[in-house]
Amino acid sequence: MRAIISVYRKEGIDKLAKALQELGYEIVSTGGTAKYLREKGISVKEVSEITGFPEILEGRVKTLHPVVHGGILFRDWVEKDKEEIEKHGIKPIDVVVVNLYPFEEKLKEGLTDKDLMEFIDIGGPTLIRAAAKNFFRVVILVDPEDYDWVIEKLKKGNLTLQDRAYLAWKAFSHTAYYDGVISQAFKKLYSIDTFGKEEALPLKRMQKLRYGENPHQRGFLYENPLEDIGITKAQVLQGKEMSFNNYLDADSAVRLVAEFPNQTVCAIIKHNNPCGVALGSSVKEAFLRAKEADPVSAFGGIVAFNDKVDGETAKELTSMFLEVVIAPDYDEEALRELSRKKNLRVIRFFGFQHAFDVKKVSGGYLLQDEDTVLYEKLQVVTKREPTAEEMEDLLFAWKVVKHTKSNAVVIAKNGQTLGIGSGNVSRVDSLKCAINKAKEFGFDLKGAVVASEAFFPFRDSIDIMAKEGITAVIQPGGSIRDQEVIDACNEHGIAMIFTGLRHFKH
């Protein structure tokens, strides 16, 4: 019996090689691995000894030889295969142990392109794929976590076909991930801004979550290794383990507050929707105003800031039940205060990269550019132009409605949401919902503004706004009844802006 071992990461490999040797396997290895195993007192044959051909091109070609791959791909249930390996003096290889050059790690070190290319493994993936293809006979190991249990089963002679299939699945997943990292790295390094006919998206599991969206669903967190920052890279400073829903809401929250790079803002998120968003002269004021916008929904919410949280703000945060607090930083007093709530998840967030958006549908995936453009052109389409104060509120509300589930309407005044209508199947219902929310918490709508993420198909919404004293509207435009809606605004003295850009969110 023969095993070939060629690994970059050496952890546990000496123990595995020794166990294989004790089971009667002859160990064949490549340069660095062979040297390491010999230092551990294990007898090893170099690949060049069995092929009769030396490593060439500074190690670029080591195992790409018929003696190696014939030994792996040999089918012991095919008579012609038996005749051929006997004819060519090829000995079967029964176990293949490989891990690959660390391209992913080297990518982050800022190497020159030519130096980085040296860490694209060629021989390793070829060995892995050959062994995995022939899993009926060959054992393939790519993960050190599998070494111990496989050895135990080999000792007992009860390694099943299902075990072999599992190891082959891991092997093909491993090479697919490796190639996915390389593929996406090329897009990033050479600014290849296109969606390919075929896409390989590398995903690496970070953790098993308690459950998915609901307790009966399994849930896992995977990261994209090509994105250096993002919610998966955030630092959890304290509290319970983040849940599936926490991650969804936290991601929505940080995307919203990122819309305000030059203003202090707080956003409170529930079920992937904002329930209160506000600007403030301080983080404390921003939080209090955001909470005031909907104090009922804020209970158990996710709170995000785009500025450092101080002790005074932390005291306000700990006065109510919250799931998660997210901010770019916290002062020492804030961390002391927040630590009083042992279960409260406190996260330090470093930002995110705009890449592309992926959504699962039955039988496939939808890929799209992320929605990063705020508007195409701001065009006043009514007789009256917005005042400076209205304009500030319109832009504030427009940024919020961009992150609200369709159909979405946001009512705002003085840099604070007064009412948010989200996820309704008609736009007028979203408006009514937002108005009812505002009235529920005692807000005066006179002088407030409205943002709608898509066009108003009829004038009915404008007539309702006028009755409430709302004075300005921002929307994309684009309806066949735009003129009817503009006329309604002019009748009521409402200023309206078209943005030329829609922000559906599903």
Curated annotation (Swiss-Prot):
GO terms for molecular function: IMP cyclohydrolase activity; phosphoribosylaminoimidazolecarboxamide formyltransferase activity. It comes from the Bacteria. InterPro entries: AICAR_Tfase_dup_dom_sf, Cytidine_deaminase-like, MGS-like_dom, MGS-like_dom_sf, PurH-like. Keywords: Hydrolase, Multifunctional enzyme, Purine biosynthesis, Transferase. Its EC number is 2.1.2.3, 3.5.4.10. Pfam families: AICARFT_IMPCHas, MGS. Gene3D superfamilies: 3.40.140.20, Methylglyoxal synthase-like domain. It catalyses: (6R)-10-formyltetrahydrofolate + 5-amino-1-(5-phospho-beta-D-ribosyl)imidazole-4-carboxamide = 5-formamido-1-(5-phospho-D-ribosyl)imidazole-4-carboxamide + (6S)-5,6,7,8-tetrahydrofolate; IMP + H2O = 5-formamido-1-(5-phospho-D-ribosyl)imidazole-4-carboxamide. GO terms for cellular component: cytosol. Pathway: Purine metabolism; IMP biosynthesis via de novo pathway; 5-formamido-1-(5-phospho-D-ribosyl)imidazole-4-carboxamide from 5-amino-1-(5-phospho-D-ribosyl)imidazole-4-carboxamide (10-formyl THF route): step 1/1; Purine metabolism; IMP biosynthesis via de novo pathway; IMP from 5-formamido-1-(5-phospho-D-ribosyl)imidazole-4-carboxamide: step 1/1. GO terms for biological process: 'de novo' IMP biosynthetic process. Residues 1-142 form the MGS-like domain. Belongs to the PurH family. The IMP cyclohydrolase activity resides in the N-terminal region. This is Bifunctional purine biosynthesis protein PurH.
